[in-house]
């Protein structure tokens, strides 16, 4: 068998074993330099004549001291667990593989075991590590499978390698006390059991190995925990039918109801990109300037404008978890794409290169991201790797005029409807303000002029000129008798002259002959001559005495 194929097979089995559950987990502490035997293989199950045994390890030497504690992840059941930071863990490493009973090889011999570590061996169907070191601390797993069936993980053990205890030095002559004989004579009988003179004083017994203090129980009492498993890539040939293999498990730790949204996003993968970068910080803060305009925009998955598909669950709780709670699904109309039954997976029918892209599956619980994963779906020829970046992307330069004559500037985004409406409202308000100010100024000026005219007339200072008709409207009122004036028919229209005036405007101006037109004196009113001019016949004069009340 080709060694590369064997290594690839073992790595695949190791990954599968790490993702699978661990039905049996134990803890073991050893000291540096010991020979350790781990994970004995179970007996034959009768499912096949030959079994594959795979031992692997996930190094935990960079995670600091570890100790188990009772955790209530699924109340009321309690299991021993430990909290390990994912940043300190390394990829699983295969240690050894064996066949039980030995299987025939392609060369005619028997395939027994393969070992990839110098200090590891398979002895009596168990993994043996000679002279363990502190760097050997980790999670060791055993996976068992038949020749034609995938391996399944059956046992695991957490191995913690502690420093070796300091050996006790043998006693030396300096440890003997020369004065023990003299002091022993006067001692009380109660000390008769003490060592006699000349006996070396033994050092105190070594302290027992330090035991890790029992940690308090770890229990999640509130919130929801979401666990997601997604394949990182799916390769297809045009015309095939396949579906995404996404597994989502939600565990509620209290009796509160919650809503869960499973959102699918899609990003195009340009052929000019060597790889796609997923900026995890932008998933939680998509409106940051760095996420809106990253420097590597064509090859970055930082922000999105639309959702490909959404399946929402409402009214979920600990006793009614998804998918049993009320569900509602929406999907953009894409040919050849549909939901896989009532699950959260996508189903591709008659797949084509247009379906290729980077797909993100994001789980929201009460509008907050709780888990997410990505899948690269493409043909083998157009496959591009996806890398997850923790920091924010570099911010791209602002859009500016092109510096090269043959390179066009990217088109500016059209203004939004909200900006247009805001501009129209502001313009209308400004125009109405200008019109209102103009009307107010005109009214103010007109009122001031009218007030000045009324005030000058009412003051009685200086002459006042009025316009009257040029006809003899008051010919019958020239009598000095007050009684005659009382008999004048006021409501009768005045008699118009026989021949209208042709030299004037039809009106006459009364010119006063004294500083005051109607001077007053005690007991009587004086009469003054009024001269008309500018109309009718210039040789005609009318002498008229009247009270000032005639004009005002």
Curated annotation (Swiss-Prot):
Residues carrying a glycan: 124, 245
Chain spans, region Disordered: 162-216, 396-415, 478-552
Modified residues (Phosphoserine): 478-479, 505
Signal peptide residue numbers: 1-20
Region Interaction with VP22 and UL11, annotated ranges: 472-497
The UniProt record lists the keyword Transcription regulation: no
This protein's UniProt keywords: Disulfide bond, Glycoprotein, Host cell junction, Host cell membrane, Host Golgi apparatus, Host membrane, Host-virus interaction, Membrane, Phosphoprotein, Signal, Sulfation, Transmembrane, Transmembrane helix, Viral envelope protein, Viral immunoevasion, Virion
Principal subcellular localization: virion
Transmembrane stretches, start-end: 422-442
Composition bias, Pro residues: 164-173, 201-211
PTM annotation: Phosphorylated on serines within the acidic cluster. Phosphorylation determines whether endocytosed viral gE traffics to the trans-Golgi network or recycles to the cell membrane. N-glycosylated, and sulfated.
UniProt region (Acidic), positions on chain: 478-486
Region of interest called Interaction with gI, as start-end residue ranges on this chain: 63-88
Disulfide bridge map: 273-299, 282-291, 316-325
Localisation: Virion membrane; Host cell membrane; Host cell junction; Host Golgi apparatus, Host trans-Golgi network
Subunit structure: Interacts with gI; this interaction enhances the Fc receptor function of gE. The heterodimer gE/gI interacts with the Fc part of host IgG. Interacts (via C-terminus) with VP22 tegument protein; this interaction is necessary for the recruitment of VP22 to the Golgi and its packaging into virions. Interacts (via C-terminus) with UL11 tegument protein.
Name the UniProt record assigns to this protein: Envelope glycoprotein E
Lineage: Viruses, Duplodnaviria, Heunggongvirae, Peploviricota, Herviviricetes
Gene: gE
């Amino acid at each position: 068998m080709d060694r590369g194929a064997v290594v690839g097979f073992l790595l695949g089995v190791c990954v599968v074993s790490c993702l699978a559950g661990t039905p049996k987990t134990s803890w073991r502490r050893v000291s540096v330099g010991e020979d350790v035997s781990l994970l004995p293989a179970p007996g034959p199950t009768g499912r096949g004549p030959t079994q594959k045994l795979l031992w692997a390890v996930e190094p935990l030497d960079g995670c600091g001291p570890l100790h188990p504690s009772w955790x209530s992840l699924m109340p009321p059941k309690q299991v021993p667990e430990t909290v390990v930071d994912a940043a300190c863990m390394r990829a699983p490493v295969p240690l050894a593989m064996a066949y039980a009973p030995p299987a025939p090889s392609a060369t005619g011999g028997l395939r027994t075991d393969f070992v990839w570590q110098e200090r590891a061996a398979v002895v009596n169907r168990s993994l043996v590590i000679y002279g363990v070191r502190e760097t050997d601390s980790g999670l060791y797993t055993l996976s068992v499978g038949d020749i034609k069936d995938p391996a399944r993980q059956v046992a695991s053990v957490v191995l913690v390698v502690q420093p070796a205890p300091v050996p006790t030095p043998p006693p030396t002559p300096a440890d003997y006390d020369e004065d023990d004989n003299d002091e022993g004579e006067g001692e009380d009988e109660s000390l008769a059991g003490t060592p006699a003179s000349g006996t070396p004083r033994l050092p105190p017994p070594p302290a027992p190995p330090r035991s890790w203090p029992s940690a308090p129980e770890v229990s999640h009492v509130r919130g929801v925990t979401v666990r997601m498993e997604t394949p990182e890539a799916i390769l297809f040939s045009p015309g095939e039918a396949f579906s995404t293999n996404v597994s989502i498990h939600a565990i509620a730790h209290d009796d509160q109801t919650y809503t869960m949204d499973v959102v699918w996003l899609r990003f195009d993968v340009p052929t000019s990109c060597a790889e796609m970068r997923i900026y995890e910080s932008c998933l939680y803060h998509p409106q940051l300037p760095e996420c809106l305009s990253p420097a590597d925009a064509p090859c970055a998955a930082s922000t999105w404008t639309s959702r490909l598909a959404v399946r929402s669950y409402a009214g979920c709780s600990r006793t009614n978890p998804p998918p049993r709670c009320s569900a509602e699904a929406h999907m953009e109309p894409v040919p050849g794409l549909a939901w896989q039954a009532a699950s959260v997976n996508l189903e591709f029918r008659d797949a084509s290169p247009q379906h290729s892209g980077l797909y993100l599956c994001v789980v929201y619980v009460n509008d907050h991201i709780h888990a997410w994963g990505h899948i690269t779906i493409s043909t083998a020829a157009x496959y591009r790797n996806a890398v997850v970046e923790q920091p924010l992307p570099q911010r791209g330069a602002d859009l500016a005029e092109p510096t090269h004559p043959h390179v066009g500037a990217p088109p500016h985004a059209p203004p939004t409807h909200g900006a247009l409406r805001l501009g129209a409202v502001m313009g209308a308000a400004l125009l109405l303000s200008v019109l209102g100010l103009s009307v107010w100024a005109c009214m103010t000026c007109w009122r001031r002029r009218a007030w000045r005219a009324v005030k000058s007339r009412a003051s009685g200072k200086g002459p006042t000129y009025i316009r009257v008709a040029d006809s003899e409207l008051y010919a019958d009122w020239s009598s000095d008798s007050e009684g005659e004036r009382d008999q004048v028919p006021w409501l009768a229209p005045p008699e118009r002259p026989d021949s209208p005036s042709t030299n004037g405007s039809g009106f006459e101006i009364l010119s006063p002959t004294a500083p005051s037109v109607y001077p007053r004196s005690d007991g009587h009113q004086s009469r003054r001559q009024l001269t008309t001019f500018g109309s009718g016949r210039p040789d005609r004069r009318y002498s008229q005495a009247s009270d000032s009340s005639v004009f005002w």
